[in-house]
Amino acid sequence: MSLIDFSLQCGRLWKNAGKSADQIQTESIAAFRRMLEHAWKNTRFYPAFWGRSGICYEDLRVIEPGDIPCITKEDVRKNYADFSTVSLRKDRTGEWIPKKKAAVIHSSGSTGIPLQFLYSRRAMTMVEANFVRLSNLGGKKRVGWRDLPIRNIHAASVGEGYASALLLTDGLSRYHAKCIVLNASEPLAEWVEKTGDFCPNFLSGYPSCLAMLLDLQKEGKIDLHPLKVITGGEPLKEDLKMEFEKCFDADVIDYYGCCESLMVGAGSSWYQGMYLFDDMNYAEVDDKGHLILTPLYNPLFPLIRYRLDDLVEGFSRTGRGELPFTHIDRILGRDEDILWFRNEDGNPDFLHPLVLDDLNVKGLTSYQFIQKNDELFYVDCIMESSDPAIEGEIRRQLDEMLRRKKMQNIHYEIIHRSRLQRNPKSGKIPLTIRQKESGR
């Protein structure tokens, strides 16, 4: 049953990629309305929540999506059992678990208390089928029958229960795929040993973890020739994407997903920006640029107009370009990634991650901004050498950033590091960290 359903979903999703943008949008809004009716009939939360805004069942067929109130992670946390369409019970730790089989995805907790999201087996199959579509939608390397079963090396920094780990252990294994997991907590020598003579046709993981494999490849310690390099979980910088493509001679796919919707969209090495898959989610943006999602493939735990913390730029439904789906230029970051200071006039002002990410200095490998107080931040830097010219150029660019923002009152310190800080919960390396000191 599972393999048959998987094949059918692969075919359906592949066919959608050949439709027009108008067809895709018409089908997406129709699926959105079906999900509205399903949520009303099968959950306790939505009839009460929408009713408080004067929305009744008859309105669901005609109401504009923007007239339906958004929900947030906090709404899900406070009303968890009322979102589920299947019976739940609490385990010994007090966590809700489904009485019928379902996949449980944990949020990392990097933006608050961790939360679980439930997925049906069919929903997981849809996500897995979309990865097949994603792999062959373009690029210079095709995945053919002779490449099956898939052989993958995954460079990981988080444990079980997270989306990537679950897709690997539960997804790939069901289709007899072979996977080696390299954990960021292991010595690099162990990575080399575990890789051995394994010949993967896929590499996957956070960009920061895959960059370690890239270094090992450059040093001649491993020799990998994958067809596809799939990244996700962290922003993928253009120069690193180009290095992956060149060094591994592979197509690069920048996968975008989250615990609320495991498959949102993807960027790649063969087109600019990122496409959002409208046959998986109905996507919107609010006036501040927050992405609002309604997953269309997971009726077990319906999330209707769920507002993410992610900020996006260049949202467009026109379908111009390689694919007929909604397109965004880039993900700007999250609200909590923005660093707030006091400017020269004593008023609150911010440094946005998008501005900070413009720091481009030859010899500067990677960097991280750490806010210490309202007038001080550190820049932790990994540099190719101790050449003072590198630090001099960093200072020149930072001074210009602060001058343009009228924040020349802000002080900073450049600190040479051998490694950057990871978020202990998510395993990601954030660009910005708030680490304010008391009494400063």
Where does each model-flagged region fall?
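Nucleotide 5′-phosphate-binding alpha/beta core
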Residues: 1-106, 113-133, 139-145, 197, ...
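Residue-level signal for inorganic ion chemistry
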Residues: 39, 107, 203, 257, ...
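Active-site phosphate/pyrophosphate- and oxyanion-stabilizing loops and adjacent acidic/basic residues
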Residues: 105, 242, 356
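AMP-binding/adenylate-forming
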Residues: 122-131, 151-209
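Adenylate-forming
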Residues: 183-186, 190, 200-241, 254-260
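AMP-binding/adenylate-forming catalytic core of the ANL superfamily
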Residues: 203, 300, 305-406
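Conserved AMP-binding/adenylate-forming
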Residues: 227, 236-319
